Amino acid sequence: MQLNYDYFTKPECKILLPKVQTNPRYKNFTQLYYTVGDEEQFWVETTLKPFLEKDGDASPQSQQRVASQENVWRNLETFVPWQGYENISAAEVEPTFQYMFNRFKKGIYVSIAGGRLQSFVPFSKANFTNDWADRIQIDPKYGSFLNFLKAQHDLNNKWNGTTYKWNPNKVCPDPRYWYANNCIVRYENPISESHSNVAQIKSMLLELVEKRHISDVKFFINRRDFPLLTRDGTEAYDNIFGDETPVPEQYRHRKWLPILSMCTSERFADIAIPTHEDWSRVKSDEGIYFPPVCRNYTFQFVHTWSDKVAKAVFRGSNTGCGWNETNNVRLKLARLGTVRPDLLDAGITNWNLRVRVSKHSPYLQIPDPGTLTAVDRLSPHQQSQYKFIVHVEGHVSAFRLSLELGMKSCILLVQSLHGWKMWYSDLLKPWVHYVPVRPDLSDLFDRIEWCRANDAQCRAMAENAYQFYRTHLDKESILDHLQHTLNRLARQFTAQEPPTDPLLLQMEWERQALAQLAPQKTSALTGQFPPSPFRNWGSLCGFEKFVTQALDPRMEMGSVAVPGKTIFKSKTTKVTLYQLGGTWFVAKRTINLMKKLEFLHEGFIGKMVLNNLVKWCPNYLYTFHYRDEPFISYTWKDYNSLEGGSRVFNPTVKESTVMQEFIDGPTLQAFLQTCTFKSYFEVLFSLCCALLLGQSLCGFVHHDLKPWNVVVQVLPEPTVVEYTVRPDPNSGEKFLTWKIKTRYIPVMIDYGKSHVVYRNVHYGVADQFATNWSLDLQTLLVSTLNEWMLRYHQSEGKENPSPDYGDLVYTANFLSTRPLKTVRDLAGWTLANKKFQTQAPLDFKIFPSNAPVIEDFLKHMAPLTKKYKISFGKGAATAAGWSFNPRQIVDLAFSLDPDQQANAWVQVPRRIYRNPLPAATNKLVATFIAQQLWNGLVVPKLGFVDWAQSENLNRSVAESIWNEYDKMEKFLTQHYWSKIDKMTPAPLTIEPYPDAFQTLVQLRLKPTRSLFLSSDKLQRLRRNIAPQYDAPAFPDYDQYRGMILDMVKDSGPFKLTPDLAAFYLDNLKPLFDEKIMEAVTNLETIKFYTQPTTKSKF
């Protein structure tokens, strides 16, 4: 969302504009233009939206554009070539963005395509933390950063004559959250999210593409005045890092998307372009002014040379990296004005006392004006009354030079100590356009006296400067310069069609897979879905089939399902209860583009992967269906839209819906408001075990495991929950199984950002190709402990804090690098790290990617298990649990009368009669078949008894059906036992295996987004792994691991003996080797994304 005005045609534009939240995700984002605050929002604006709009009509062209041949800069070099900008592609967008976003907070991404401004995306990292806080020190005399900042505040009041009250809450005493502009640091709280310069830059680019022919090109614009990218790979901010510190390894790239800045030097690769002040100046002549400053640059410099005062003049602030007269050239210039006022009228008009960081000082410095006093301002018109104008830079070039060149005065240009240049600097010639002055001002008085003695020469230089101003600094020249620069850059892009973004590819494959699951025809809803006495996988699976068969994709969902209450509503999502066949389920709907993608992903991983986990673990949510709604049926009030409309919404977009089971219970956030310490730890242990199981079976990472993304089901009585997670050679049962007795079943919800491995291929959104085993635990602990700290502070003064809060401190010390000793320590630690984007790496222990972090955490928590008498620990796996037959449940649900319902029960044994029994030559496979058939028969058999009694079924009919079940049960038991008993255990061979594993591990390939975004990298990769394309694909090992888990937990007549279990676990050991499985997944993912014609694996 943005305001109606990008600029104003009246100087009254400085009338206070109401602050409107233009980014619905961040309250303090009140910029004029929608500014993205995180990586996800950037991806939506720069990749997803252009992808969805690529078939749209191009914007109409209003007039004939000027070709490059007519450009006044066509024979001039507007930038020095650099190999980092040669042979580049769209693959450089992401690494360049990461560099600017993570290290410098803000910038603008621009894409020009088809002669129009396709993308103009300002960005500012909302939860910014720097990587240089450890280099910041203060003089020990201050004692703390807060005291230092108060001293700065007091000095600012003193020197500027203000009386602002000191408010410690308005500054941030933690330097990790500061940001810098090389030597100048910002530390206000909250950090200012301004929109300065953005309106001018966008206006300039819009007029450029309207009036000039511009080739397709992509680039970034630096919103700061200090350049960002060095040519030699060292840190840009030399005053923080020094002169020779290389950038961190993750930001050392061979190729970059061009970064355009307002200032540069030979050290930097930034390309200088016309400044926002240049554009404001030329547009103010047209009566156009830009917020928020709305400065009027229209001046009439009418003073003749003979009427001008024969003195030099300077007015300005004390900006610059120095902090006193010895190292700040502007302060030194002001002092010289007091020494020879007959030659020089120089002074500081306001004191810029922002804290400075300098490579020449070990401590932060507060500028010290000494004995200087502020002087009156002089307008540009008043300054033009002087014959000589001293131009001196601040911490970079001073942008005012373009205006000063038009004042018809002689410029005394102080040479840049660091070689700073603006877009036209190389065209200015000493003694032609200006009089050069040494950087240290040592010859300033001599230059002024020379100017007085050589009036005619200075008048000629003033005239040359003015003519340069008219020919090279007007609007046409600005547009010419941009045209020439951008068209030169466009030629550096390779002609190859850039690869499709891997997340977009994944989105399309997920959509295809879900479409293939849709039934060929739907059935009319005829009755009630059979209620389940308790939550179980078989019943949920049956309701999934019931939902998909009952909901016609061509019809509005509300025409079949009955809507209930809305249980959640935000700016992007609406969650509503629906009832179908007497059973409640949840429908999450959205029209937000990113949420639609996340819902698609959630539907895919739910139906393909996570639904299976519910069979073994009650802590995952079952997904029934995903659909794109056929009609636009929502209204604005259906969402918490922002006043004035929001960029989140497009009224022509249809909603997307994901349907999931309804868990009746509070969120973990609400649960933590009143729960006991014991119940909290029970919930925590249950979630840890669920994560262990998900990681082992399918590489699950939730990526947003916060208290509001967990619903706690409260049971009437405690129950024992088992988590059999992996083989354990030290266990007598050969498998590691955790058990907990509890009334609280926490269920994870909202999988839109989650990662899984499906058929040996990575699928994810937040981190598409990586499994981070510690991330969910870290997020869960920090966020839940933060809720405890909020509860603690709310209770202060009302009751005596429980001594058990110390156990929370003990819990946090598993993650914290520094020992936390008190609740106060814990509160500070959680406050600083409660948001993932601001978590400081120095605050957290570093765990190897494949380390058993959660198991180590559970060991760490063992003393609290004993203290609170929690029934939790390792044990032997027992029954797999009661799981209904999904096919029988669906048949029962669509039955029209009691006869059809009875037939739904009897068809279970009859289907086994009618179909040939599966056979196997391997003892493990044969045992698995027998287990599955027996469980699929016995569970419905027991369920039939309850149903027959509730329906008062005729006794003879009931006995007849029971006998069919009984006969089939005996037949299956005898048939398979006779075969299994004669078999000798033989290794189960799963091709390709095991020799392929050794070669595989040696490849050490890892899929990354940057790998798939670069045509060159893809070509090299295809050559390197070419033999693998012809090799057989690895089988779906997740299915085999699930099969083994089913068998280990089975306690029926075909239960594995300990010897047989030990034999096959040793035989199938590679299936549970994390290094091997990681290598398999990485290779299969790379093959999947790099094959010339990628086929869907569904």
Swiss-Prot record:
Pfam families with a match to the protein in the record? Glyco_transf_90
| Annotated signal peptide | none
Q: Which domain of life is it from?
A: Viruses
- Coiled coil feature spans: none
Q: Which Cys-Cys disulphide bridges does the record give?
A: none
Matches recorded under SMART domains: CAP10
Q: Which PANTHER family match?
A: GLYCOSYL TRANSFERASE CAP10 DOMAIN-CONTAINING PROTEIN, KDEL LYS-ASP-GLU-LEU CONTAINING - RELATED
Put simply, this protein is called Uncharacterized protein 035R
